[in-house]
UniProtKB/Swiss-Prot annotation:
HAMAP family, sorted: RTC
Family membership noted in the UniProt record: Belongs to the RNA 3'-terminal cyclase family. Type 1 subfamily.
Organism: Trichormus variabilis (strain ATCC 29413 / PCC 7937) (Anabaena variabilis)
Catalytic activity: a 3'-end 3'-phospho-ribonucleotide-RNA + ATP = a 3'-end 2',3'-cyclophospho-ribonucleotide-RNA + AMP + diphosphate
Protein name: RNA 3'-terminal phosphate cyclase
Keyword Nuclease: no
Localization in the cell: Cytoplasm
This enzyme's EC code(s): 6.5.1.4
Length: 348
C-alpha cells in the first residue's frame, strides 16, 4: 500500500485527486492521511467525497474513511477500470445539496476511463462554474483540447448551468477508451491568434452579460488583442453570472474567468478576467499556472517524454509532481529559473 501525506506541499485536493486517479489506473492500494490539511476546512468536502466514490465505482474498489470531513482514506482498487455509463451527483453526498465543482470529479475519472477498454458516458451534476475550480468552459475550451494533443479523446456538453451556492448544473462527458498517450513538447506558444469570450447570466437581466462583454472587448482591443465576445442570457435554477476568456495561440491554449457577485459591477467582473489574461500574456509562456499541474498526470502516463514552459511554478505543480513520483511513473524535473517542466517517461 502506498502511503501519501495529504498535508504535503499545498495540502489541498489535488493530492487526493491525483492519488485516486493513479490508484485506479495502476491498481495500487493507497492510504492518504491529512487530507486537505492546508485548507480552512480540512477533510473531504462534497466534491472530494464524490470523486472518491466515483474512482471506487469505476474500478469496483473498496473504501474506508469515505465520509464528509474525513481526513483519512484507504482505497483498494478492484479488478481494473470498467468503461460504461455512470452518473455522479455532488449534491447527493451532502444534506441540503451542494454546488461542489463537478469538474474536479471529471478530472479524477477522465484518465482512468480513457485508458480503459471501451467507451464511457458520464453524467455529472453539481456546480459547473465555481470559483477556485476549473469551470466547465475551461474544461471544454482549454483542458480537453490540450489533452487531445496527447491522445485523450473526450467531449463535454453543458446541460445546465450550476453556480455557487445552489449548484444544480449538469454536464455530459463522453470518453473514448483505449487511448494511447503521447508526449507534449511545448516550449514556445507562438503568436496570439484570437481571444474568444463568453459572458453569461442565468435568471438575471440581459444587460449584465452584455456589459461584461462590452467592457472585456474594449479592454482587450485597447491592449492590441484580437477578440470576439458573445453575451448570453440563459435559464438556470438560480441567478448567476460570469465571463470566461479563452486565448488561442499558435501552439497553445489558455483560459481565465471572473464571477459576478453582490456589489460587484459587471464591468469589474470583466476587468478581473481581462487582468488575469493580460498578465499571463505578458509572461510569454505557453502554459498557464493551472494547466501546468493538470498536464503532469497525462504526461507521466505517456509513452514519450514531455517538456513545457509555464507562466509560474506553483506549489500545486510541485506537489502534484511529488505525488506522481510516489507511484514510480518516471522522473519529473522542474527548472525554477527557466520555468520548464520536464517529464521523463518510464516507458521510453
Amino acid at each position: 500500500m502506498i502511503d501519501i501525506d495529504g498535508s504535503y506541499g499545498e495540502g489541498g485536493g489535488q493530492v487526493l485527486r491525483t492519488s485516486l486517479s493513479l490508484a485506479a489506473i495502476t491498481g495500487e492500494p493507497i492510504r492518504i492521511a491529512g487530507i486537505r490539511a492546508g485548507r480552512r476546512k480540512p477533510g473531504l468536502a462534497a466534491q472530494h467525497l464524490t470523486a472518491v466514490r466515483a474512482a471506487a465505482r469505476i474500478c469496483h474498489g473498496e473504501l474506508q474513511g469515505d465520509a464528509l470531513g474525513s481526513t483519512m482514506l484507504e482505497f483498494i482498487p478492484g479488478g481494473g477500470v470498467k468503461a460504461g455509463n455512470y452518473i455522479f451527483d455532488v449534491s447527493e453526498v451532502q444534506q441540503g445539496g451542494s454546488a461542489g465543482a463537478i469538474t474536479l470529479v471529471l478530472q479524477t475519472i477522465l484518465l482512468p476511463l480513457a485508458l480503459a477498454d471501451g467507451d464511457s458516458h458520464i453524467t455529472l451534476r453539481g456546480g459547473t462554474h465555481v470559483i477556485f475550480s476549473p469551470t466547465v468552459t475551461y474544461i471544454e475550451r482549454v483542458y480537453l483540447p490540450m489533452l487531445c494533443r496527447m491522445g485523450i479523446k473526450a467531449q463535454v456538453k453543458l446541460g445546465a448551468w450550476g453556480w455557487y451556492p445552489r449548484g444544480g448544473g449538469e454536464v455530459n462527458l463522453q470518453v473514448k477508451g483505449g487511448c494511447q498517450l503521447c508526449g507534449l513538447n511545448l516550449l514556445e506558444r507562438g503568436e496570439l491568434k484570437r481571444v474568444q469570450g463568453l459572458a453569461v447570466a442565468t435568471e438575471l437581466p440581459a444587460h449584465i452579460p452584455q456589459r461584461m462583454a462590452n467592457r472585456a472587448e474594449n479592454l482587450l482591443r485597447t491592449a492590441g488583442l484580437r477578440v470576439s465576445m458573445q453575451a448570453l442570457r440563459e435559464k438556470g435554477v438560480a441567478p448567476g453570472a460570469g465571463i470566461f476568456l479563452t486565448a488561442e495561440y499558435c501552439n497553445s491554449l489558455t483560459g481565465f474567468g471572473g464571477f459576478g457577485r453582490l456589489r460587484l459591477s459587471s464591468e469589474k467582473v470583466a476587468e478581473i478576467a481581462c487582468g488575469q489574461l493580460l498578465q499571463f500574456h505578458e509572461t510569454g509562456a505557453p502554459v498557464d499556472e493551472h494547466l501546468a499541474d493538470q498536464l503532469l498526470l497525462p504526461a507521466a502516463l505517456a509513452s514519450e517524454s514531455s517538456q513545457y514552459r509555464v507562466a509560474e511554478v506553483s506549489t500545486h505543480l510541485t506537489t502534484n509532481a511529488a505525488v506522481i513520483e510516489k507511484f514510480g511513473l518516471g522522473k519529473i524535473t522542474v527548472n525554477q529559473a527557466e520555468r520548464v517542466v520536464a517529464i521523463a517517461s518510464d516507458k521510453t
